[in-house]
Regions:
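N-terminal Rossmann NAD(P)H-binding glycine-rich loop of SDR-like oxidoreductase domains
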Residues: 10, 18
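Conserved glycine-rich Rossmann-like NAD(P)H-binding loop of the short-chain dehydrogenase/reductase
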Residues: 26-40
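Conserved NAD(P)H cofactor-binding loop of Rossmann-fold oxidoreductase domains
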Residues: 74-80
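Substrate-binding pocket helix/loop in short-chain dehydrogenase/reductase
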Residues: 82-83, 90-93
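Active-site helix of classical SDR
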Residues: 106, 142
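Residue(s) in the substrate-gating loop at a strand-loop-helix junction
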Residues: 126
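C-terminal helical subdomain
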Residues: 164, 168, 180-221
Length: 235
């Protein structure tokens, strides 16, 4: 029987993924780690809930999850704002939670990822990590750091002869999540959660939801003239 760990799983897409995994017969335990508590109206017999602040210095907390074969990192935050309106504390916190914490978690489980046994690892990144926008300057920078980090580690894994990969999930705006102080609505995130799990278990390295419908054109415009696309996003 399998165990999963969802970091940031108390709300939003993380909770939707945790619920999907818990409904499957092959998973016996789904660990949820979040700074916040799981909502009282959400419960599942397979859930094991733990509270942890990703800005903490000591990550030995995660040594207890030695039996997992699935790691999904969905923790992160951000909101629309120009750089001039961001505080220095906000800059430090968003880089720590969105980027540094993910790298530390991957480091903790790297021996499991870089092995011949199946290990499924995914990270919620963002389409903001692929392009510039004045309203996502630091948020986008934190996600761009993850994009390059994941791509680099995946090449390292490939060259070492391992089949496991880290999945970069880079959506645009997701309805039903807590981004920009939104509220969790599991009815709106269920479909995306299923798609993410499918790509995770296929050991894909990149999943951009609505790529053909929306983001293929946007990314091409950005590639053609990133300055013009930045001005377009500002307007």
């Amino acid at each position: 029987m399998r165990e999963a760990l969802v970091v940031g799983g108390a709300s939003g897409i993380g909770l939707a993924i945790a619920l999907q995994l818990a409904e499957r017969a092959d998973y016996c335990i789904v660990h949820i780690v979040d700074r916040a508590q799981l909502p009282e109206d959400i419960c599942h017999e397979k859930f094991r809930c733990h509270q942890f602040d990703l800005t903490s210095e000591d990550y030995a907390f995660f040594d207890r999850f030695g039996n997992i074969d699935t790691l999904m990192i969905t923790a992160g935050f951000g909101h629309l704002a120009l750089f001039k309106d961001l505080t220095e504390d906000y800059i430090v916190n968003i880089m720590n939670v969105n980027a540094t914490a993910v790298m530390r978690l991957v480091s903790r489980f790297y021996d499991r990822i870089a092995s011949s046994g199946d290990f499924y690892c995914g990270v919620m990144v963002s389409i903001a990590g692929f392009m510039s926008s004045p309203f996502f300057s630091v948020y986008g920078a934190s996600k761009a750091a993850l994009k390059i980090f994941i791509e680099s580690v995946n090449v390292e894994l490939e060259k070492a002869g391992f089949s496991n990969r880290i999945l970069n999930v880079s959506p645009g705006s997701i309805k039903g999540t807590g981004f920009s102080q939104g509220k969790t609505d599991l009815a709106l995130t269920e479909g995306l959660a299923k798609d993410i799990i499918q790509h995770l278990e296929s050991k894909d390295d990149l999943f951009i939801p609505q790529y053909e419908e929306v983001f293929k054109t946007v990314l091409q415009r950005y590639h053609d003239d990133f300055r013009a696309e930045g001005r377009h996003s500002y307007d």
